């Protein structure tokens, strides 16, 4: 008996076309174009999940540096002072304090400054 693969092909095509919903023009309607667009987008998504971590760390360091300089310390001296003081706050929390709780950040900066001298 002859096996017809229409159902499998239809499901495969449908899978890519569903993933390409919202794309413009043929990228959402033509199977081959949609497949290429989806595969490329998945590559970008994979890559950018890694890039996101780097970008956020960069942003946190930038914010901590700006706040530390307002308190008379460079970023590296501030972080070294925190290490000497035994403060184990991560960069994400420090950056959040620098933006939202300036007074608390100033106290932490004073602690770091006192441990440096």
From Swiss-Prot:
Keywords: Ribonucleoprotein, Ribosomal protein, RNA-binding, rRNA-binding. One of its GO terms (biological process) is translation. It holds the Pfam family Ribosomal_L20. One of its GO terms (molecular function) is structural constituent of ribosome. InterPro entries: Ribosomal_bL20, RIBOSOMAL_L20_CS, Ribosomal_protein_bL20_C. The keyword rRNA-binding applies. GO terms for cellular component: ribonucleoprotein complex; ribosome. HAMAP family: Ribosomal_bL20. Belongs to the bacterial ribosomal protein bL20 family. Binds directly to 23S ribosomal RNA and is necessary for the in vitro assembly process of the 50S ribosomal subunit. It is not involved in the protein synthesizing functions of that subunit. This is Large ribosomal subunit protein bL20. It comes from Nitratidesulfovibrio vulgaris (strain ATCC 29579 / DSM 644 / CCUG 34227 / NCIMB 8303 / VKM B-1760 / Hildenborough) (Desulfovibrio vulgaris).
